[in-house]
Amino acid sequence: MTEPPVISVMLIVPDADAAVSWYKAALGASELWNLGGVAGLQIGGAPFFLHEVNPDNPAETSPGGVTNVRIEVFTDDPDGFIARAVAAGAVQGSAVVGHQMPWGTHRQGGFTDPFGHKWSVGDRSPFLNQ
């Protein structure tokens, strides 16, 4: 039987070592591996990857600039998760507020990490009624 594909994100960062340290300290990420310039991390069992910017690759010339990707985190304590990130240097985004969804209230807010990546942080409610 063929295994289904798995999706993850790779975040382009200006300094991979600094980014690894920040994601571990601020978000509680654990390091899966580190090749120097490219690293694998995970939060809550969800893997993601960091890649140091390569100025010779035009697709990677704008770390910290405009992005059309947002990383989503689901936790029991969205307020605490965001506060920890902001205390470590992230920029506060939208405050955690309740949104009425088909399953009830979903609390969500966000921040921008020091490398320009947008994060939304919500409670686990989308997964409780499946």
Enumerate the predicted regions with their spans.
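Vicinal oxygen chelate
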Residues: 1-10, 20-112, 121-130
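Short, surface-exposed ligand-recognition loops at beta-strand->loop->(often short) alpha-helix junctions
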Residues: 11-15
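Conserved ATPase active-site switch/coordination loops adjacent to the nucleotide-binding site
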Residues: 115
